[in-house]
Amino acid sequence: MARNLTRMAALRYRDFRFLWLGEMVSTTGSQMQLFAINWHVFQLLRGQTFTISAFGSDIVMGSEAFGLGMLGLVRVIPIVMFALLGGVLADALDRRRVMIWTRVVSALIAAVLTYLTLSGQIDVNSIYLLTALGAAATALDSPARQSIVANLVKPRHLANAISLNTLIFQIATICGPALAGLLVAQLNIGLVYGINTATFVVAIIAIGLIRHRGKIKTAANIGWRALIDGIRFTFRTRIIMGTMLLDFFATLFASARTMLPIVAGDILGVGAAGYGLLATAQPIGALLVGLIMSLRSEMKRQGLILLLSVAVYGMATAIFGISTSFALSYLMFALTGAGDTVSMVIRGTIRQLMTPDELRGRMVSVNMMFFMGGPQLGELEAGLVASVFGAPFAIFSGGVATVLLTAWVAWRYPSIRRYNNADDLKAKRR
């Protein structure tokens, strides 16, 4: 029991406790809304097709797959536009205040979604517009949210705090889709948006109770120089750059989550409730592996483990793409979550140890363009390929591409292959 309490040492800090509880609630609501939006677009476009002319021939494309892919595009454009600005704000302003205002915007967006859906005025274009606005708010929020953790706990408890924050996402991606699936199947999808609105209000109150006020340690101004400094540091630190490329390639080509409505509805034939259940597989795999890792001592040869975990992610995605069995699909999707968690923990350790605190917000913002831009572009890529060749081919080919690109990163960035554990990076920084 004492050892378990020690692993949750970060929760002893009052401010971090409020942050953690607020984020647990709002992240669950956000995952519910993410599920609902994907299913909403799928239902609005289901069974529709459109034709485009290219190279002298007509190509018939499925609207539902293309529409789901377009969600990725409308999410990634605001991330590219605002993520770097979010990093500068996180290093120059009170991170707590930035988080409050971005959540106010997110709550208003969810409220509008609720009203339009319940009143019957919702359409695909409205969903796209509100999704883009929500992505912009997230882009401005994430650097502050990730960077403030180091301000709320002592350095020796930072790793524990990061692990607990990872646990939030894993639990939310299990509970959120499952709850949303039940609500959509039994009641009205608009209620999911309404619940998300309420969760943002809870998060705003929790963040408002945090006593910490940001104190700028350096003259980090909101300007081009501060922006360029963060970009230069990230791109010149090769081991950080290599880990970001690994993340980007994996999520760009092997992001099967956006195709889940098609897999569940058309291939496996399990409907909205089955879609919600299938969506829990990846976070359950992530949660199980995360718990196992928390019970082990520090791993050795982490660079090779990182590369292997991304390769496993790609192989599991490929098998998921050609599966017609719900059990096999669930198992493979869970395996992608396991591989991603191992990769995420090692990548996060490398970046935190290699980045000075005064640059952390900007490093996070650059990483965000890879971490969040990859999946959203991946949704677009998968949607385009699936609309022409079908969802199974899109998912399978993406998994194979991930394995091949992982091999390229292993060759191009030998510092990743040679990385053993945190002591390697500590020695390099001394």
Language-model segments: what does each one mean?
Residues M1-R430:
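Alpha-helical transmembrane-bundle signature of multi-pass membrane transport and export proteins
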